[in-house]
UniProtKB/Swiss-Prot annotation:
Species classification: Bacteria, Pseudomonadati, Pseudomonadota, Gammaproteobacteria, Moraxellales
Signal peptide: none
Record-listed E.C. numbers: 3.5.1.88
Record has Metal-binding as a keyword: yes
UniProt name for this protein: Peptide deformylase
Cofactor(s) recorded in Swiss-Prot or TrEMBL: Fe(2+)
Annotated residues for binding of Fe cation: 92, 134, 138
UniProtKB keywords: Hydrolase, Iron, Metal-binding, Protein biosynthesis
Gene3D superfamilies assigned to the protein according to its UniProt record, in alphabetical order: Peptide deformylase
InterPro entries: Peptide_deformylase (IPR023635), Peptide_deformylase_sf (IPR036821)
Active site, UniProt feature: 135
Family of the protein in this entry: Belongs to the polypeptide deformylase family.
A Pfam family this chain is assigned to: Pep_deformylase
Encoding gene (name): def
Length: 176
């Protein structure tokens, strides 16, 4: 397994629309395993392949406290089951150290394929509903900051760029 570099906002590659997975291969399974390792190390609860510069429709998530309930969604489709929305404070591994409220449908149906290539369908609410919609946005080239006002988005961009520069300086200092 390997840790994968996570793209940071405003990297334009985050705007790439992901292509469907044509076949679940060993390469796809390995990418999912690497994505789990990367997500757990970050740490995070969800990661879309687009965030690690692989522009295919693949999402990994684990919402459990003990990090022992991994979920994989290949070629996911999400359908709102209600018009009712709920605000939820979101963060993102591609937008480090930034959190803000986003309104999303409170209940959704998820249709996807698992790592064995089998189709499945679940209904979700709460954190799972929020997380799958957040990760689906990544596959469509969208970030949670796109839901914010232009002024807030510009401030987020400046903060993230500063954080990324600081991380780069720390990497250089460690290499010396």
């Amino acid at each position: 397994m390997a840790l994968l570099p996570i793209l940071s906002f405003p990297d334009p590659r985050l705007r790439t629309i992901a292509k469907p997975v044509e076949e679940v291969t060993d390469e796809i399974r390995q990418l999912a395993a690497d994505m789990f390792e990367t997500m757990y190390a970050a740490p995070g609860i969800g990661l879309a392949a687009s965030q690690v510069d692989r522009h295919i429709q693949l999402i990994v998530m684990d919402l459990s406290e003990s990090k022992d309930e991994p979920m994989v969604f290949i070629n996911p489709k999400v359908t709102p089951l209600t018009e009712e929305t709920q605000p939820y404070e979101e963060g993102c591994l591609s937008v480090p150290q930034i959190y803000d409220k986003v309104d999303r449908p409170s209940r959704v149906k998820i249709e996807a394929i698992n790592l064995e290539g089998q189709a499945f369908e679940i209904e979700a609410d709460g954190l799972l509903a929020v997380c799958i919609q957040h990760e689906m946005d990544h596959l469509n080239g969208k970030l949670f900051v796109d839901y914010l006002s232009p002024l807030k988005r510009q401030r987020v961009r400046e903060k993230v760029e500063k954080i990324v520069r600081q991380r780069e300086r720390e990497k250089v200092a460690v290499k010396r």
